[in-house]
């Protein structure tokens, strides 16, 4: 009886605090359509994944909370996918960005960039998360994770809220910025173009 009495009081408190709805929603485990947030490319890296350490001795500059250094066209231009994307949409910046150990790059949407092409270069422990649902404003969120595969490019939706948690080693990521801002080049446009490009190339093989 005492246990039942305790749980009744506890449940009433949850109702009073408005947590009952939150708890029920958090118990659900809905399937998320991750292609709203990111899309894995079929084309694998042939050059950047092996040559990126060459640029780590360059000067690093602060860039939106990251440390960044450029990747020269002599390297990224050997990637057929990136060369084709650049011909269609034109890159403004192509480079490697670095996060320090034990660093949380908090929830945000990119200021100007609508989308990018990313590839994780170092595969120590880090997590890239996208918010899929706000359960309690500024407090509780559902999320999905982009689990980067080695040597793999991803179309990345910079206008969906995302964050990065990095642990004990520096984290290196290939990324790019386009000449077009978020109002001129959307994630959906880039994703669809890359999908068509890869389908055409696959049919030629």
Stretches found by the model and what they are:
Residues 75, 102, 125, 162, ...:
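Residues that cap or initiate secondary-structure elements
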Residues 133-205:
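Catalytic core of Fe(II)/2-oxoglutarate
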